[in-house]
Amino acid sequence: MEKVIKQIVTINLEAGKANPAKVGKDLAPTGINLLGFCNQYNEMTKLQLGLVVPAKITIYEDRSFNVKLKTPPAAFLLKKYAGVEKGAAQPGKEVVGSITTQQLRTIAEIKLPDLNTTSIDRAMKIIAGTARNMGINIEDD
């Protein structure tokens, strides 16, 4: 018998650091086992420590769940590679950092599975647009 989906929840958590206190406000109303989710998430993300890894949780009527990991947010990766804490308050007028085209390609390769394209060049353009909106310049190698 097919399980009936009750709800789908997406949350952003730091890899390997999920605990019931952090996920409680988002997942407690769904009725799933919070400790079970945290243990499963931490096990799945133990090789990605230090990154923010979004999780898409499909919750079924019987309170069981399925976890699917996504790639880290583009903004998080751009800030990490540019070495900045946050994006520009006034993008276009203010520059907070810069990345090389090789770093842009690396970020695009990481994000490619979650983007609506299969071309690395188009993925680079998508990530470059995000960088521009954050006040991060892209410099040629």
UniProtKB/Swiss-Prot annotation:
Q: Is rRNA-binding one of the keywords UniProt gives this record?
A: yes
Taxonomically, the superkingdom here is Bacteria
Record bears the keyword Cell cycle: no
Query: What range does the record give for the signal peptide?
Result: none
Q: Per UniProt, what is one GO molecular function of this protein? A: structural constituent of ribosome
Q: Name one GO cellular component term.
A: large ribosomal subunit
Provide this UniProt record's keywords sorted from A to Z: Methylation, Ribonucleoprotein, Ribosomal protein, RNA-binding, rRNA-binding
* UniProt modification remark: One or more lysine residues are methylated.
Q: What's a single GO BP term from this record? A: translation
What PANTHER family would the database entry show?
A: 60S RIBOSOMAL PROTEIN L12, LARGE RIBOSOMAL SUBUNIT PROTEIN UL11M
What is the annotated quaternary arrangement, including any partners?
Answer: Part of the ribosomal stalk of the 50S ribosomal subunit. Interacts with L10 and the large rRNA to form the base of the stalk. L10 forms an elongated spine to which L12 dimers bind in a sequential fashion forming a multimeric L10(L12)X complex.
Q: What does this protein do?
A: Forms part of the ribosomal stalk which helps the ribosome interact with GTP-bound translation factors.
Q: Which family does the record assign?
A: Belongs to the universal ribosomal protein uL11 family.
Protein name as it appears in the record: Large ribosomal subunit protein uL11B
What is this organism's lineage?
Bacteria, Bacillati, Bacillota, Bacilli, Bacillales
Name of the gene encoding the protein in the UniProt record: rplK2
